[in-house]
Amino acid sequence: MAGHSQFKNIMHRKGRQDAVRSKMFSKLAREITVAAKQGLPDPAMNPRLRLAIQNAKAQSMPKDNIERAIKKAAGNDGENYDEVRYEGRGPGGVSVIVEALTDNRNRTASNVRAAFTKSGGSLGETGSVSFMFDRVGEIVYKPEAGDADKVMEAAIEAGAEDVQSGEDGHVILCAFEDIGEVSKALEAALGEAESIKTIWKPQTNTELDEEKARSVLKLLSVLEDDDDVQNVYTNFEVSDEVMEKLSA
């Protein structure tokens, strides 16, 4: 396990689930609203909206919240969000990609830059680190979905490219453009997924010691807590020994 998956796991162990969940619903709602504004409010005719709704449902977001986010796109509340990607280097030289939906580019850029600077990292130009990542689809299932063989068979039939199974569940990867079809086929075989989204997958990882890892985790936590930030991706990894210390 590496990068953001480890970060999520550590935050889960530290008991931040409720706070993270509340903020997650807010960010999912923003993605739904933006998707609905950019296309038709009908998920059957809007692939991005369909994916956003699928992911929201997978995260147990209430139906009323989803419908409210869609209706908000049709309103004249003056909220228009720009999609912005930031790239930079964190402590230990790790690569970091930040995706944001913002109604104030200056505010978001200032906050993101400050987070990098305070952590000892630096914000770079767009494209400065993304070439070291691949854009792919990620579908996650809980362990209860089935054993490794069952999930592997379903993933192959669905057209997925890779499957990683472990005690925490199953992570299925597919081509970026195939995520809609693959997730639909997997749902028919395995039921509803725990999450469905597109991610930046690092081509190689940078292993960190405990000190540098703590600094990176602090940076990721600050970025995740920013209301404008939707997703954060990085290529760090730590040993099992360091992981246990960070989770304590």
Curated annotation (Swiss-Prot):
Q: Which one Pfam family would you cite for this protein?
A: TACO1_YebC_N
Cellular-component GO terms for this entry: cytosol
**Name of the protein:** Probable transcriptional regulatory protein BCAN_A1755
Q: Which PANTHER family match?
A: TRANSCRIPTIONAL REGULATORY PROTEIN YEBC-RELATED, TRANSLATIONAL ACTIVATOR OF CYTOCHROME C OXIDASE 1
The listed locations are:
Cytoplasm
Q: What is the lineage of its organism?
A: Bacteria, Pseudomonadati, Pseudomonadota, Alphaproteobacteria, Hyphomicrobiales
Query: What family is this protein classified in?
Result: Belongs to the TACO1 family.
A single BP term in Gene Ontology: regulation of DNA-templated transcription
Q: Which UniProt keywords apply?
A: Cytoplasm, DNA-binding, Transcription, Transcription regulation
**What InterPro entries is this protein classified in?**
Integrase-like_N, TACO1_YebC-like_2nd/3rd_dom, TACO1_YebC_N, Transcrip_reg_TACO1-like, Transcrip_reg_TACO1-like_dom3, YebC-like
Q: Which domain of life is it from?
A: Bacteria
Q: Which GO terms describe its molecular function?
A: DNA binding
Q: Does the keyword Disulfide bond apply?
A: no
